[in-house]
Every structure is written in C-alpha cells, then in structure tokens.
Design a protein with these regions (language model features):
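Basic/aromatic recognition patch in beta-strand/loop cores that engages polyanionic ligands
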Residues: 51-85
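Enriched for short, Lys/Arg-rich terminal
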Residues: 28, 73-77, 81-109
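Basic side chains
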Residues: 40-42, 54, 69, 93, ...
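Basic, Lys/Arg-enriched alpha-helical interface segments
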Residues: 1-65
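Intrinsically disordered, low-complexity regions enriched in small/polar residues
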Residues: 7, 11, 23, 57, ...
Length: 109
C-alpha cells in the first residue's frame, strides 16, 4: 500500500487558476510572473500527495465542519479537502489572501 494521495482540482479551483493567470498576465501586464505564480501554486498543491492533513483546518463555518484545510502559497490561499478512505485530495478553491474569503463563501450559500 502506498502512502501517497491522488491530488485533483475542482472545476471552481481550475477556474480560479485561470482567473489568477489572466489577472496577473493581462491586468498587471506580467505574463512571466503569471506563469511563475501558477507554477508555484501547482508545485505546492502537488506536495499535498504526502501527509495532506499537515495544514490546519479553516476556523470558520461552513468550511470548518467540512474539514476544509488551507495552504498558503505566496499571497494566495489554496483550500482543499482530504478523503482518507479514497486517499484523495481535492482542491476546492484558490483565492487571493487579501480578499474577504469567509464573506465570499458565506454569500454563496
């Protein structure tokens, strides 16, 4: 039996990555920076294949009850779920850390 987890992205998380790239490349006019930033995010997400629960749970609802973890990467925060039975990690969302993330999540209930 392997100790590694399969890591995947939700549709929302993939959209978040596209939006992050688009904003940095097109609004800030820094496509190289956008590519590098996505590379750093993806590298950290890939590292969740081993001991994914090492990062803390969020402390606000409803995500705390869902056992949502958060992983900071530069100015961004990756939110993900761990399924120990399936040995799987699913990245749920990726947000810029300066946003009111709790407010965004709770407004989408």
């Amino acid at each position: 039996m392997t100790d590694s987890y399969k890591v995947g992205y939700s549709v929302d998380a993939l959209d978040d990555l596209r939006e992050i790239y688009s904003y940095i490349a097109n609004e800030l006019l820094a496509p190289e920076t956008a590519t590098a930033q996505l590379g750093r995010i993806r590298k950290e997400v890939r590292s969740l294949d081993f001991m994914p629960a090492r990062y803390t749970l969020v402390d606000w609802e409803p995500w705390h009850s869902m056992k949502m973890h958060h992983l900071p990467v530069d100015n961004f925060i990756v939110y993900y779920l761990v399924d120990d039975e399936k040995r799987a990690v699913t990245v749920a969302r990726i947000f810029y850390g300066g946003r009111d993330i709790e407010g965004i999540i709770n407004s989408n209930k």
